[in-house]
Each structure stands twice: as structure tokens, then as C-alpha cells.
């Protein structure tokens, strides 16, 4: 190798090491400041701005900018509702109106739309840079879920799109727990468990839109994981709670129990459906399964 080529190689190595060291230094400084002031505290915007000049395509930096704008965008407001449970929460105050009807008051998040859009733009850039980072994709879905307050059309669209991308791509997908950890490769089984968390959250919100999202996500996951008893049981739970169609609920619960006969959660739900139908024979059947 000629001396000129050796110099070029050495320069490239030095530049690479310097860039990595700079990246680590900004991330270290960010984590230290985050521990002291939070996502949007004093000095955070300046640090992120300087970081972005040095590393405009750093996923860690773009996530930091997302959290900064999202935190700045958030506020709270009090909303009156007739329901005794709203978005999975209980009211902080209940009063009676002039007709003697209970009015329940909830404190919920609200968002400044301009700052919320800024937060999403940072995430979109991170997804463009690293499309196979699940944690970044989840952040976008989670942001929409908080913003939409139970009418979760954009949330569902994002999650279903992610399911399609993950299940049809041959790429290795990574997940990073937080800014202090290293990303790891996610298996299909791990991804399935992550989607079960979304199913739970959709169901927990308890709105017509979220129940529909719960059903559609469970059906989509069942199409890929046909032997997973939980997704089949989820479909039964949709019919039990959202439709009050107890016969159809039992049909799916029985399918689920054929795959996993000792699933206590499914057995308990099937028992509820049997009692709703006032079918003592079925009730005894599920009670016996529960005791085994």
C-alpha cells in the first residue's frame, strides 16, 4: 500500500473514531441533563440544537427532539362526562347537575397542535433514517393514541402498518429500551407480545373506536399467529364486551381453549359469557375447567 493510501486510511479511521466519540459525548450529556431537568427542562433545547448540528441524522438526537416538543405540547384540561369511567380512568370529582344526574370530571391531556406536529416531524425523520427501529415506530403510535383520546383511527393505522412491515420484511428489527441502553434484535414472538400490549391498551380505553381497534389488531395478529390462543380469545372478548354477543364470544373462547386449555383468563371470560346466557350446563363446564 502506498504512503498516500495509508494516510487516507488513517484519516478515515481517525474521523470515524472522532465521530463516534462525539456521538457518545452528546448522548452522555443528554442523559445527564435529562436526569436533572427532564425532557424539556432548562438547557435541553440548546443541547439538542447543538447535537443536531453535529449529527443531523442521529436517531437518539431525533428522539430527544421528539420528547422535547411532545412535553412542551402537553397540557391538561378538565372535561365533564356522563360515564363513570373515561379512557380507562376514574373521575377525580363527581357532582350532580340541576336534574340530580351525576356528572363526572376527568383531568385529561391536551396538546398544542403546532408543537405536536413538530414532535411528529422529528419522529418521521428518525423513521426515515432507521425504519427498522421498533421503539421509534412505537413512539409515533403512542403519541397518536394519547392525542386522539379514544378515537384512535391514526393510532390503529400506524400499528397495523407496523404489523405489515414487520411481518413481511426480511430485515432485522431492533428495539431500544431507553437512551441509556443498546438496541437489540426483536424476534417474531417478542413482537407478538408487544402487540398484545397494544391490544390490552386499546381494550382498556373502552371507547367504541378503541374496541374496534382491539378487534382489528387481534384479527390481524391472528392471521399471522394462528396458534396463539390470546389473539383468538381477544376476538371473543370483543364480542363479550363491545357487542354483548355471548354466543359468538363463546365460539372464540372455545377455539382459544382448544389451543390452551389451562388459560385461566379465557376460562373466566367464558364463564361470564355462559352466565350471561343463563346456560347452567356451560357454566358447569367452565367451572370444572377452572378447577383443574
Q: What positions do the PLM features span?
A:
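Short coil/linker segments at helix-helix boundaries
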Residues: 68-125, 129, 139, 146-197, ...
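Start-of-domain marker
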Residues: 22-80, 108-112
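Hydrophobic/aromatic packing residues within the alpha-helices of TPR/SEL1-like helical repeat arrays
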Residues: 48, 116, 123, 159, ...
Amino acid at each position: 500500500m502506498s504512503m498516500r493510501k495509508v494516510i487516507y486510511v488513517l484519516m478515515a479511521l481517525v474521523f470515524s473514531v472522532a465521530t463516534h466519540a462525539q456521538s457518545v459525548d452528546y448522548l452522555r450529556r443528554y442523559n445527564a441533563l435529562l436526569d436533572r431537568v427532564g425532557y424539556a427542562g432548562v438547557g435541553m433545547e440548546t443541547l439538542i440544537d447543538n447535537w443536531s448540528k453535529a449529527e443531523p441524522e442521529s436517531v437518539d438526537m431525533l428522539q430527544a427532539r421528539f420528547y422535547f416538543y411532545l412535553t412542551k405540547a402537553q397540557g391538561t384540561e378538565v372535561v365533564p362526562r356522563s360515564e363513570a369511567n373515561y379512557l380507562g380512568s376514574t373521575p377525580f370529582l363527581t357532582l350532580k347537575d340541576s336534574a340530580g344526574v351525576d356528572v363526572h370530571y376527568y383531568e385529561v391531556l391536551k396538546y398544542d397542535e403546532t408543537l405536536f406536529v413538530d414532535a411528529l416531524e422529528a419522529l418521521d425523520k428518525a423513521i426515515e433514517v432507521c425504519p427498522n427501529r421498533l421503539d421509534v415506530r412505537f413512539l409515533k403510535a403512542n403519541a397518536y393514541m394519547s392525542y386522539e383520546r379514544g378515537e384512535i383511527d391514526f393510532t390503529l393505522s400506524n400499528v397495523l402498518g407496523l404489523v405489515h412491515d414487520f411481518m413481511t420484511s426480511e430485515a432485522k428489527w431492533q428495539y431500544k429500551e431507553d437512551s441509556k441502553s443498546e438496541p437489540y434484535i426483536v424476534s417474531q414472538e417478542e413482537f407478538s407480545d408487544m402487540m398484545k400490549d397494544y391490544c390490552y391498551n386499546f381494550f382498556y380505553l373502552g371507547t367504541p373506536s378503541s374496541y374496534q381497534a382491539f378487534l382489528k389488531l387481534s384479527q390481524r395478529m391472528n392471521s399471522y399467529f394462528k396458534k396463539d390462543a390470546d389473539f383468538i380469545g381477544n376476538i371473543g372478548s370483543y364480542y363479550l364486551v363491545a357487542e354483548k354477543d355471548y354466543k359468538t364470544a363463546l365460539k372464540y373462547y372455545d377455539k382459544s381453549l382448544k389451543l390452551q386449555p389451562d388459560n385461566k383468563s379465557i376460562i373466566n371470560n367464558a364463564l361470564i359469557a355462559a352466565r350471561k346466557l343463563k346456560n347452567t350446563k356451560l357454566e358447569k363446564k367452565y367451572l370444572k375447567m377452572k378447577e383443574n
